[in-house]
Amino acid sequence: MSIARTTITSIVNGRRVPPSAQMELRFNAPYDWARVLRFFSGRAIPGVEQVADGVYRRIVDLHGDAGRLTVAKHPRKHCLVATVEGAVARHVDDAFAARVATMFDLGADPAVIGSGLARDPWFAPLVEAAPGLRVPGAWSGFELAVRAIVGQQVSVKAATTIVGRLVERAGERVVHEDDGAPAWRFPTPEALAACDLDKIGMPGKRVAALTGTARAVAAGDVPVDREHADLATLRGAWLDLPGIGPWTVEYIAMRAWRDPDAWPASDLVLMQSIAARDPALDRLATQKRRTEGWRPWRAYAALHLWNEVADRAGGARGG
């Protein structure tokens, strides 16, 4: 997305009212807001994120300040309207707008992506059914990495529950009004590294992987965001961490590093979806060869397949 096309309007309030700011973030139509919300809703971190009444809300923090981010689709314009409330609003600038735009994949060109995938007869009907599908991102690369580690070999619902427990143990409540909206800051790497994760609901090896990753990020031993390293460096650094395998890295690459060609090959839902279309493709190696024709848009291919399953199941599946 071009930041030149982003409108940022500061709203000056009285001293007793927390500062706020509003942004209009343009996208290339069509934009499937309903399915973006469904994806976020099924994975919303308790206390940190919330999807309700067609709106996404979460706690965000930057430079030591925190506040609420609320995002809704404009009823007429091709844009999302993002409102920031609280101390963090003072940091709203082009870089902040770009971060929100990246989280909601506003820079994607659905016409180019759709035409690329629709060359495969598997995807032509999926693209026709959901032409504005996006790859939902994350506010923080570390937050998404935690989500990916916790989500190893468990259901979306189970992972969401466990991440909620992590927030309760290592996060910080930054909004104290009891209004039912998000109020918790996601744990910092330092806080999570120091947290006792006994009886958190994960196997010991996964707990060790999570704690080790938090320590590595806190120490600056591993890059977290694409602005600090290229994709090859990021993948290599994360694959070197104990307990971090290809699925975890590709999931992070898809949603946090914004690699449009990321492919979490061993994802059970994706593997089942491919095998259902061609029973001969029942092995990881043969499936990966089949995906070569989907380059450079395999992350969007994954979302289309997950979305198809979610449409049938009526809930979040995969990722």
State each model region's role.
Residues 1-319:
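HhH-family (HhH-GPD) DNA N-glycosylase catalytic core used in base-excision repair
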